[in-house]
Amino acid sequence: VTDRAAPAKAPPGERRVLAALALAQFICSFAGSNMNVMINDISRDLGTTVQGVQISITLFLLVMAALMIPGGKLTDRYGRKRCFLTGLVVYAVGALLCAVAPGLGVLILGNSILEGVGTALLIPPVYILTTLLYPDVTSRARAFGVIMALGGIGAAAGPLIGGLITTAVSWRAAFVFQALVIAVIVGLSRRVRDPLPPDPERPFDTGGAVLSATGLVLIVMGILAADNDLRLMIALILLGALVLAWFFRSTRAKERAGREPLLSLALFRDRTSNLGLITQNVQWLLLMGTSFTVAAYLQVVRGYDAVRTGVIFTAATLGLLLTSLSAERLAERRSQRTLIMAGFTLSVAGVAVLVALVAAFSTPWAFVPGLLLIGLGLGVMLTPSVNVVQSSFPEEQQGEISGLSRSVSNLGSSFGTAIAGTILVAGLTKGAYAAAMITLAVIGLAGLAAAARLPRAPGRTAPGGAPSGAAPGTEARPPLPDSGQPPAPRRPHRA
């Protein structure tokens, strides 16, 4: 029986460990949102275009999506602390490279590749170590609450902090800020211990990791090519689909042969979970698509600077934080299906308000009501969608499904900046802005349709995070704000 008694106050050493893990989540969430307000400054300084910055942001999110599951698998083989520290170093090198980037190519190498790889290596250990170091439900919930709070602050305040740094110093200073935070985390990490030994003999599906990552990259690059070459777009998307089909066929063959694949196909056999994954993907697509589109429009078409753009986005930040803080109370009163549908309804309404008011008024205040509605909607539905997915599986599959869940969310983020951003940068006019936002609204309606097909009865969250009637041990893991929760730890494999 799990001991739910309140644990003693954590000693200073444990608090420093938690600070290291929470700051790691903060900086990764910050990196996912702060660049949107630097579009003009980066474009002007590096002699590139809005599309160039869009590619860098999209690829960063895509690299996270493609490598989050492999990153979680590597922790079993090489150890959680080693992967955590390696990820921090890789991330810091990428941030410093961005700070001195002479052109777009180096920025993509530093931000999209190195920071993306670093995030995929360091985020899985954050959640795995928290699960291992805080074994009782109460202390673990408190630890996850601290980590999620810092992650939420990083994601929500990223545009404002990034805008202030860019306006006061330079966009390059924002990357130096990231490197400094990483240095603090490395110092705090000296007290981090790994309760489980690494298992160098544990198999790793290298072929599966390469195939899945290649397929996702080809599809997203195809979307980015849409405004330049339609035939190239079609070719890349078709090729990506073929590579992913190859990945799933290879995975099935490995399972039949008794080998451990990158991802178990059993995760896709539950209808409720599949619908939940769709809603997660669409939610993050809406969030990042709207963020990039509105930020680019404000800076390029309206001519606003980074700090003014960041201030406007505080409306969405406040909305998201308000409903996120009320998530537990809402879950006790309404089913998860109802909350997800309400979230999509609010978010789509927010997009419609953004299109209507921005077309009618030139004041910055025209953006506030729509962004507030979108923030309120996202805050209502993000956690219920994760709970729907997590609670569909027993304890032994929680690790794999949580990794898949976060990868799907990050993939939605990259789709959002790719799809909406591509439509916007094709014209950079009011018409292109409206077209991008309407496209997001239509995709949001598709998410609403998926949510409507979720089961009606299950979903009210019982104490501990599991829906009422869920099997013991299926408590949903706390979700990440913008970069995924990894697979939970496994005991070392023995041949």
Model-based region annotation:
Residues D45-G47, G79, V100-V106, V169-S170, ...:
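Helix-breaking motifs and short loop linkers at transmembrane-helix boundaries and internal kinks
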Residues E14-V37, V50, V126, V243, ...:
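12-transmembrane solute porter fold
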Residues L21, C28-S29, I57-F60, M64, ...:
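Structural signature of transmembrane alpha-helices in multi-pass secondary transporters
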Residues M38-L67, G103-I108, V307-I312:
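Extracellular/periplasmic helix-loop-helix junction of adjacent transmembrane segments
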Residues T167-Q280, L286, Y304, V311-I312, ...:
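Hydrophobic transmembrane-helix bundles of small-molecule transporters
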Residues D76-G207, E395:
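Helix-loop-helix hairpins in multi-pass membrane proteins, especially solute transporters
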